[in-house]
Amino acid sequence: MDAAHFVHTTFLGYLWCFTRLFIKSPSGRKRFNVLGALNAVTLEIITFTNESYVNAESVCELMRKLAASGLGILITIICDNARYQKCAIVFEVAEELGITFLYLPSYSPHLNLIERLWKFVRKECLYSKYYADFNSFRTAISSLIETAHIDKYKELKSLMSWKFQSFKKVKFLGV
């Protein structure tokens, strides 16, 4: 589980030209927040979205959606150490729904598969694309997230591999 905050502005993928190029850009004042949970086996994504803030209530709402999805198995959520994931209300709702948390070490987004998904969404929806209004921006992101596990399955399957780099016989230096 992780949150992504998509800002309605221009993201340039790559640009190399010898002449001056003017690119349209929206104001960048609106933000589309997506709190998501990724099923690492089926690559299905369950999300909670808003335009204000991601907080403990958002996490509780996402956990309720996860529990209502009817997986029929114990749910363990792997998450980073965001403050809103460690509130008392979040623990109460998790206990009520039978959900457990597994926290990743600090500063290790490379271990969270959903971070790769957010990078994929940015590449597909935002890089070198212009959205005149916020509704089209939000719709593009939402529709990709909702259908990615079907339409972009091959790309996601290679991106969401469980192969993580490991280091053997590494010496750590103390300072």
What kind of region is each of these model predictions?
Residues 10, 47, 88-89, 120:
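Short, function-defining helix-loop hinge/capping sites that tune catalysis or transport
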Residues 58-102:
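RNase H-like DDE/DDD metal-dependent nuclease/strand-transfer catalytic core used by mobile genetic elements
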Residues 21-27, 97-113, 130:
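RNase H-like polynucleotidyl transferase catalytic core
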Residues 13-16, 91-94, 116-117:
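Short, glycine/charged-enriched secondary-structure capping and boundary segments
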Residues 51-55, 109, 129:
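Pocket-edge positions in alpha/beta enzyme catalytic cores
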Residues 1-60, 64, 160-162, 167-175:
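Extended, low-complexity cationic-aromatic segments
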Residues 115-175:
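C-terminal anion-handling pockets and recognition modules
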Residues 79-81, 88, 103-124, 135-137:
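RNase H-like two-metal-ion nuclease catalytic core shared by retroviral integrases
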